Amino acid sequence: MAEAKFCLSCGTARGSSAAEEDGGTKTRLRCAACGWTHWNNPTPVLAAVIELVDRDGQVLLARNAAWPGKFFGLITGFMEAGETPEDGIRREVAEETSLSVDSLSLIGVYEFLRMNQVIIAYHAAARGEIRLSPELVDYRLFAPEKVRCWPAGTGRAMADWLRSRGVEPQWMELPPGKRAIEVDTE
C-alpha cells in the first residue's frame, strides 16, 4: 500500500523528522505543521494451518487469486475491529473455505518484515465440505509429511507445526530473486 504524501490530520505535505521518544531519538514521518506522527506499526495478520480431521488429518493449502505462479499457502486474513485473534481466524477459515473449526491452538507469532506484518498462526482442526471464496482459486490437500515449507512468513509457522507433530519439515528451494508466491508448490 502506498504511503500517504500528506498529513492525515491537517493535509500538509509530510516529511521525515527526528524527535526524542522513549529510548532516544527516532526518525519517523511527522507533520511539521501539526506534529501528527505516522507510526507505521506492523499490521497483525492471522494464519491457519488447517488440519482436516474428517480427511485423515490432511493439510489444506490454498492459492490466492492475486498471487503469481502456482503457490499454495495457508489461509490468512486480517482481524476485524472488536474481534479476538481466535474469533478472527475461525471467521477467516469459514469465509474462505466454508469449513467449521473444531479447535484452535496457537502455533506461534512470526515477523514478516517485507510486508510490515506480524503473523499470529494457529493450528485449526476443521471439518466440512470445502467451498472456496472468490479470493481463492484452488486448493490442495497434503499429508503432513508431503508439505514443502517456504522460507518466509507463514512457511515458518507450517514448519513449527510439522515439528510439533514429529515431522521434520522439507523446505522448498527458491530460485535467486524469487519470492515464495512466485513459484510452483504443486
Q: Where are the regions a protein language model picked out?
A:
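A short coil-to-beta-strand element that immediately follows conserved catalytic motifs
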Residues: 17-18, 99-108
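Short acidic/glycine-enriched loop/turn segments that link adjacent beta-strands
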Residues: 25, 68, 113-117
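Conserved Nudix-box catalytic region and its N-terminal flanking loop in Nudix hydrolases
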Residues: 52-95
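Acidic, metal-coordinating catalytic segment for phosphate/diphosphate chemistry
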Residues: 1-48
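Active-site-adjacent beta-strand/loop module that shapes the phosphate/pyrophosphate-binding cleft
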Residues: 110-138, 144, 161-162
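Short beta-to-alpha loop/turn elements within the nucleotide-binding domains of ABC transporters
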Residues: 43, 83, 134
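Long C-terminal interaction/binding lobes of large macromolecular proteins
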Residues: 128, 141-186
